[in-house]
Amino acid sequence: MESSFEASKSLNENRDDIELIPTQSQGSPSLSSSSTITSTSRLGSNQVLIRIYFIDDTHKTLSIDPNNTTGDQLWEMVSEKLGINNRDSECFFVWAQNDEIEWLLFNHQNISEVIKNWGILKKRYCNTEENSPSSSTSSPILSGLSSIRGKKSNASSTSNANDGSGSGSGSGSGSGSGSGTSTPNSPKGGLSGFLTLGRKNKAQSPQLQSQSSSLSTTIASEHASKLRSSFPTLGEEGQFRLVYRPTSVLPLELERSINTAEATHLFYIQAIHNVINSNYPCEEDVALKLASIQLQVLVGDQKMEHQDHFKESISRYIPSHLLSKRKAEEWEQLVIPQHSLLRGSDSLQLKRAYLETCQRWAYYGSTFFKAKYIPANTSFFTQEFQGKVSIGINGNGFHIIDPKEMKMVSYSYRDIIAWDSTSNSFTIKFKIGQDKKFETKPYIFKTPQGELINDLISDWSEEWESKEKKNNKDSKKK
C-alpha cells in the first residue's frame, strides 16, 4: 500500500495544494475559472487532477474528465488504485462532504453535475437555524396515525436525471405511499448528482440510468477537522471534497467477512473517526485500549520520542467526551504502558482487534445525524435528553446518543411504530412493552436533515424485514 494511504500524513499531504487543475482553458466552462494551470503532456485536453480523500485526511490524486466521469466510474478508479477487489469494493463508494454533511454520489451522474448541484444541497440541508420546531411541533404520527410506518415514496421517476426534475424516492417523503396519509410537502424537483439509497446501487441498464431521480438520502455527519476541498480552485462552488469510504447500509456480517488489508484499513480508520469524535462513546478503560492500539499501528514499538508525539497529538487518540477529564501528562501515563505491551504486534491484526472491540457496540456502523432533542413535555425532571444529541441508524436499529452524559437509548426496527419528517424536524414513535400490552413513546428532534433520516431508516427497515423473512422461512424448514 502506498504511503499516502497510511495513517501518518506526509508533509506534502498537509499542504494547501491546488487539487483541481485544468490543463487547458478550453475545458469545461464550470471548471476552468482557475488562474493556476499546470502544463503536463500526460493529461488530455479535458482532464483535471482531483484528490480523493479518505476519512483520516490522507488522499489519492486522480486524473479525470469531470464532464464524462460518473460517480460509478470514479468509484471503480479509486478501488483499482487501492487494490480493492470487486467483492470488497461493493462495501465502499465516493461521498461528497463538507464540514456539516456528507452525500453518497449518484452512480451515473457526472462529477461536473455534482459540483453544479452542491450549493443547492448544502442550502437545503445545512440551514439549521431557520424554521426551528418547538416542543409543540405537530406531526402526523403524534395525531392518531400511530399505526403507520414511515417509508420512502416508491414512485418510479420517469424524468431525465440530467434535467434535475421529477419527484421519485429522492424527494425525501415521510410516511409511505399506500398508507393513505399525506406527508410533509417536499421541495419540487430532484437534485442531480446524488444517490437516492443508503447503499451502492447495482449496475443499471442505460435505460434505467437515464430515468433515475437524484437526491441523496443518506448521510449527515459533522466533522471537527478543517475541510480540505477536492476542488479549491472553484471558490465557493467547490467547497467540498470527495471521500472514499464505507457505504451507509452495510450489514455487519458482510463487513466481518472481508479480511483484505486494504478494506480492513478503511474500516479501521472509519472506526477511529467515530471513536475520537465520540460517535462511539466508550468508557475510559476501553478508550485507553483503543488508543494504545492506534499508537502501535501508527508509530510502531514504543520509544521515548513517542511520548512527545502522543502529548502533542492527544486529540487524535482520546475521544472528545473524555479528553478534558485528564491532563495530557495523565493520559500519557495511562496509555504509554499499554502501548509498550503491544511491542512486535502485527499491524493488520491490531486493526482487526480494534474493529472487533467496536463491533460489540450496538451502534457500530451507524450513520450519525446531529440533532436537538425536543422534549414532549415541559417538565425538566422527566426529560430523557438535554439539547444536542446524535441520532445513529444501523442494522440494529435507531440510537439516540448523548456522549457527554454517556447516555444512550436504542430501539430495534420491530419496536418502531411510525416515523415522519419535515424540512426542519424528525419525529419517531416506538412501542414499549410486549404483545398487546405496550405503551408508545414519541421522540421529536430539530434537524434540517429529517428527510435523510427518514429515507435511511426506510433502507435499513427493508434490509431488516428481508432478513426476518429469511430467518422465519429457514426456521419453518427445520
From Swiss-Prot:
<dbReference type="InterPro" id="IPR000299">
    <property type="entry name" value="FERM_domain"/>
</dbReference>
<dbReference type="GO" id="GO:0005829">
    <property type="term" value="C:cytosol"/>
</dbReference>
<dbReference type="GO" id="GO:0010810">
    <property type="term" value="P:regulation of cell-substrate adhesion"/>
</dbReference>
<dbReference type="Pfam" id="PF21989">
    <property type="entry name" value="RA_2"/>
</dbReference>
<dbReference type="InterPro" id="IPR019749">
    <property type="entry name" value="Band_41_domain"/>
</dbReference>
<dbReference type="InterPro" id="IPR029071">
    <property type="entry name" value="Ubiquitin-like_domsf"/>
</dbReference>
<feature type="region of interest" description="Disordered">
    <location>
        <begin position="202"/>
        <end position="221"/>
    </location>
</feature>
<dbReference type="InterPro" id="IPR011993">
    <property type="entry name" value="PH-like_dom_sf"/>
</dbReference>
<feature type="domain" description="FERM">
    <location>
        <begin position="48"/>
        <end position="468"/>
    </location>
</feature>
<feature type="region of interest" description="Disordered">
    <location>
        <begin position="129"/>
        <end position="196"/>
    </location>
</feature>
<protein>
    <recommendedName>
        <fullName>FERM domain-containing protein B</fullName>
    </recommendedName>
</protein>
<dbReference type="InterPro" id="IPR051594">
    <property type="entry name" value="KRIT1/FRMD8"/>
</dbReference>
<dbReference type="Pfam" id="PF24522">
    <property type="entry name" value="KRIT1_FRMD8_FERM_C"/>
</dbReference>
<feature type="compositionally biased region" description="Low complexity">
    <location>
        <begin position="22"/>
        <end position="39"/>
    </location>
</feature>
<dbReference type="InterPro" id="IPR035963">
    <property type="entry name" value="FERM_2"/>
</dbReference>
<feature type="compositionally biased region" description="Low complexity">
    <location>
        <begin position="180"/>
        <end position="189"/>
    </location>
</feature>
<feature type="compositionally biased region" description="Low complexity">
    <location>
        <begin position="129"/>
        <end position="164"/>
    </location>
</feature>
<dbReference type="InterPro" id="IPR019748">
    <property type="entry name" value="FERM_central"/>
</dbReference>
<dbReference type="Pfam" id="PF00373">
    <property type="entry name" value="FERM_M"/>
</dbReference>
<dbReference type="GO" id="GO:0005856">
    <property type="term" value="C:cytoskeleton"/>
</dbReference>
<dbReference type="InterPro" id="IPR014352">
    <property type="entry name" value="FERM/acyl-CoA-bd_prot_sf"/>
</dbReference>
<feature type="compositionally biased region" description="Low complexity">
    <location>
        <begin position="204"/>
        <end position="216"/>
    </location>
</feature>
<feature type="compositionally biased region" description="Gly residues">
    <location>
        <begin position="165"/>
        <end position="179"/>
    </location>
</feature>
<feature type="region of interest" description="Disordered">
    <location>
        <begin position="19"/>
        <end position="39"/>
    </location>
</feature>
<dbReference type="GO" id="GO:0031156">
    <property type="term" value="P:regulation of sorocarp development"/>
</dbReference>
<dbReference type="GO" id="GO:0005886">
    <property type="term" value="C:plasma membrane"/>
</dbReference>
